[in-house]
Every structure is written in structure tokens, then in C-alpha cells.
Amino acid sequence: MDPQLPEPEPLIALIEALRRLPGVGVRSARRMAYHLLQHDLQGADMLGRALSGAVQHLRHCARCNSFTEDEVCATCANPKRDPGLLCIVETPADQNMIESSHGYRGLYYVLMGRIAPLEGVGPRELDFQRVIERACDGVVQEVILATNFTAEGETTAHFLGDALSERGLKVTRLARGVPAGSELEYVDAGTIAWALMERRST
């Protein structure tokens, strides 16, 4: 006996589409679908139109690879940004986090991923040649590698760091330290050790 009640094809299609979101399993997708259809039809319509509009009108910036409606995004076109600094991040979300710190006024390049051999993602899939060409435009003086401190992020930073250093660019890496406001007993030993080694006078 089939334990799953039969569902209409449009509902199945919606659930499968929602499952494509990161961290969303079939149960969560089904709950979201039921909620939208039962309690928020207006929201469902807004979501559909917004997603369709984003797919149709957004593209990758010719300079930084982030999302934009125009050929060059507003950040890259901003004359107040420092063109000599280029910060390389994995995703637009990472870019937004760095921007929200208000401590960086240079430009960005968004990889839209990281090297992940088990997922079949390597330098070619991330178009590293384009990254290198962007960094070697004759204006950039320093490249800041701001990939995540995961195994994949470290591999990505190492690969890019070697490639860019060979071309005479100054390459730096985001420092890892004890997060502001945290208590040392709750910070892992590796982070504390690294923070001690990288300590500097204040």
C-alpha cells in the first residue's frame, strides 16, 4: 500500500522546485507549498512574479560577476570605490556581509562558488582565467582573498593566491580570529592558536 497520498501534478512540481533551495528537504518544501496555496495566495503570486522577473532581467556584471540589471553593476561603476583593491568572495551573500562591515571601500569579484572536487567544481568551472584577467588589469594593486575558512574555501584561496602571486600582485587573506563578543571557552582551539600567532600591537 502506497503510504503517500497522491498529489496533483502542479503541487508535485511546486514541491520539487522548492526542494532545489539549499537546506530544504521534501517535508519542508511540502509545508511551504501548502502554506502558500492555503494561506498566502497573494504571496505565492508575488513569489512567482519576482522569481520570473529575476530570471529574465538579472545577469552577471561584466566586471565583478555579481548580479545586476546592467552590464556593469552600481558598485563597480561607483567612482568613490578604490579600484586598487579587489576582494574575491565566493557568493553575493559573502559580498554583502563584507560590505555591511563598512570597513572595505574597494571593488569585488564574486566567484559564484568554490573549488569542490567531490562536486565536480574546479578552476575551469569557476572560470578562474576570468578572475586572473580581472585582477591583472593594471589597476589592481592588492587582491584580498575572502573565501570561507572551509576546506573548499582554503583550497580556492590557495589556488588563486599562487596564480596571482606569480603575476606580481600583492595577495592577502582575511584574518581569522576570535569573534568580537565571544568568550574564549566557547572558541575552538585552532581559532585561538591562530589568533595568538597573528596577534599585533594595538
UniProtKB/Swiss-Prot annotation:
A zinc finger (C4-type) spans 61-76. Disulfide bonds: none annotated. The keyword Zinc-finger applies. GO terms for biological process: DNA recombination; DNA repair. PROSITE patterns: TOPRIM. Residues 84-179 form the Toprim domain. It comes from the Bacteria. Coiled coil: none annotated. Keywords: DNA damage, DNA recombination, DNA repair, Metal-binding, Zinc, Zinc-finger. The keyword Zinc-finger applies. GO terms for molecular function: DNA binding; zinc ion binding. May play a role in DNA repair. It seems to be involved in an RecBC-independent recombinational process of DNA repair. It may act with RecF and RecO. NCBIfam families: recR. Belongs to the RecR family. This is Recombination protein RecR.
